[in-house]
Design a protein with these regions (language model features):
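N-terminal localization/anchoring segments of enzymes in phospholipid and broader phosphate metabolism
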Residues: 1-146
Length: 146
């Protein structure tokens, strides 16, 4: 009797555990993919000009370390303001603090001027932002994914 109970309990626990491994349904979710980079935008033209100045071939990529939080914020703010076609923004931690709300305002302004905005956030860093993110996701030019 005890063995039968333990077997049934193990099977039930296994079924529950395996059920938790299933992915959510993609039904109703819109398909989305990145827009290919183009040199026709103001940022693309600037990048092409800088590449020519550096005499760097097209296959070379680079990064520019931003040493201070102020520099990093200013760079993000500037790039969002200059966007004309699309923005793909990915963050591990996004807080509803002053800088986070200012950047969300910049993203909303970009969407209002016709820029497609895709925001990918780690859900662990968005505590208390569900309502705000849901509202942003209702904008026709904004996709929020957690």
């Amino acid at each position: 009797m005890f063995l039968r109970f333990c077997s049934a309990a193990c099977i039930a626990l296994l079924a529950l555990a395996l059920g938790g491994c299933a992915l959510p349904s993609l039904e109703g979710r819109s398909h989305s993919q990145a827009i290919a980079a183009t040199a026709d935008t103001p940022l693309g033209q600037t990048a092409r000009h800088l590449r020519q100045l550096a005499q760097a071939p097209e296959s070379i990529t680079a990064i520019v370390p931003l040493d201070s939080p102020q520099e990093a914020f200013a760079a993000r703010h500037f790039l969002i303001q200059q966007a004309t076609h699309s923005l793909d923004v990915q963050y591990y931690i996004w807080r509803a603090d002053t800088s986070g709300l200012m950047l969300l305002g910049d993203l909303l302004a970009a969407a209002d001027r016709g820029v497609r905005v895709r925001l990918l956030l780690d859900d662990g860093g968005t505590a208390g932002m569900d309502s705000l993110l849901h509202t942003l996701n209702t904008h026709p030019q904004i996709e929020v994914r957690l």
